[in-house]
């Protein structure tokens, strides 16, 4: 019996696999502090078309481009194979001030696989904020795309839902997998889930 028990213990030890590390959050700012501003163009009115480059995680920079009544978000990896390439992923009227990165800790430190950014739409015929949607964005070195969206007003605990959505799709393949809406589907969420097709 002791031998059988010892064999069972050895088999259990050999066959047991540690569960995957749970997703964690890290926050970075896309507010003015820590970001670099650069005007685009020299024509009258171009001061409204401004590029803001902010530090991110995983070797990424987060770029915020104000285009009059539109604002778009993009990513760039300055130490990647295409250091000057910007991949624009989502746009709306405005955006929140932080990027919520989802990832895991490994021997190299924190490795993000997703970024969550609050995108804001303008309330019709007013200068106020209307619908707000969390854009869930796949991020990897040189690769990024919208993989889903969660409407803040239509879902309770929208942040928690967006975290679970990002963690469940951490291996999302840009260009092959289709983005979806998490939780309650709304027109605003569908719009964000489409991402930006043209670069």
Give the location of each predicted region.
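A sequence-level detector of short, solvent-exposed, charge-rich linear segments
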Residues: 15-19, 73, 181-184, 188-189
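Polar/charged alpha-helical tracts
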Residues: 62-64, 73, 97, 112, ...
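Charge-rich, low-complexity N-terminal segments
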Residues: 3-5, 16-87
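Functionally engaged cysteine thiol sites
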Residues: 35, 48, 52-56, 132, ...
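C-terminal partner/receptor-binding element of secreted or periplasmic proteins
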Residues: 151-199
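Short helix/strand-capping turn motifs
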Residues: 88-156
